[in-house]
Amino acid sequence: LLKHDTLGADAAQALKHTLLMFDAFHDVKELAAAGNAHARAVMQSWADAEWFTSRPQVPESLTVTVFKVSGETNTDDLSPAPDAMTRPDIPLHALAMLKNRRDGIEPEEDGKRGPVAFIAGLKDKGHLVAYVGDVVGTGSSRKSAANSVLWHTGADIPFIPNKRFGGVCLGSKIAPIFYNTLEDAGALP
């Protein structure tokens, strides 16, 4: 689309914030070398890291409402394996986060639906909700677990339905790969 007369500029704008280009990178590079202004603008934008520098600044300080989950929270608590079939539908799957009763956490329907209304009540206080645990994110379902946490604590991504970024997750210990997954999703672990 970079060569298209009417859509070239829009395509360039979209590509400036697209990072996973795989083999298509070479197509953009070749178009730029051949003199295509839109492709050159995309290459320059990537070189200038506009995809990163255009993101909102991290505030100097944050006021958060704490959602405290005692003990170890593994990824199966956040993204239960029996509900794996719903993982592609993040809002639906996030309903199962912390669905099993545990010390200090009262699910709406034990074994089926986590403390969704309780978390919503914390959000109603007007601040970010920070997920706070003792040990957080051990286990193998890191991305879907991060999606569940961010669904309840993050912010909508403009023009991307059913996906959120940002959020705050604190723990005495956060599993290293879960930590990296949260960072990749724009959260502050």
Locations of the language-model features?
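Alpha-helix N-cap/helix-start positions at coil->helix boundaries
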Residues: 4-9, 36-37
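Extracellular cysteine-rich microdomains
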Residues: 1, 9-11, 98
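Fe-S-dependent hydro-lyases/dehydratases of central metabolism
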Residues: 13-189
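Alpha-solenoid helical-repeat scaffolds
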Residues: 2-5, 18
